[in-house]
Regions:
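Signature of N-terminal electron-transfer/Fe-S-associated modules in redox systems
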Residues: 1-161
């Protein structure tokens, strides 16, 4: 059994220490070691986007990131999007627009949307579709998801005014 590596990172605003094997994916550690199971395992090869998180301001699929690479980094998972028991406007918009069904892809879409709206608070439909191109949904199709992102952007802009 390989020696475990000690890693320190900030997850959802909280300093977190964990031990991991050098070959463990960040997804495996988030779910199985830290207990953040909101990040879903879909394809486990980076193609579906279900496990999308924000790592140092960029969206990544942690199924393709080694956990040891998280040393000293900041990450946001789906659990870090809401403010306590109050849903984030993105989450609320996904509910109101029925932009989810089975829920496997939803955390990845919401996290990717958060990163998009942090970078571009008023994206065009084309920009939304481009940004979310690496997130796949087999249930709802994409129109409701795109509408949810547009509505969330409008709500968030109104909150800043």
């Amino acid at each position: 059994m390989p020696a475990k590596t000690y890693v320190q990172a900030t997850i959802n605003g909280e300093h977190t220490d964990f031990l991991c094997e050098p070959r463990q994916s960040l997804l495996e550690v988030l779910r199985d070691v830290i207990g953040l199971t909101g990040t879903k395992e879909g394809c486990n090869d980076g193609n579906c986007g279900a496990c999308t998180i924000i790592l140092d301001g960029r969206i990544v699929t942690p199924c393709l990131v080694l956990a040891v690479e998280a040393e000293g980094k900041e990450m946001t998972t789906i659990e870090g999007i809401a403010n306590g028991s109050t849903l984030h406007p993105i989450q609320q918009s996904f509910l109101e627009n029925a932009a989810l069904q089975c829920g496997i892809c939803t955390p990845g879409f919401i996290v990717a949307t958060k990163a998009l709206l942090d970078e571009n608070p008023d994206p065009t439909e084309h920009e939304i579709r481009f940004w979310l191109a690496n997130n796949l949904c087999r249930c709802t199709g994409y129109d409701k998801i795109i509408r949810a992102v547009q509505d969330a952007a409008t709500t968030m802009q109104g909150a800043k005014a």
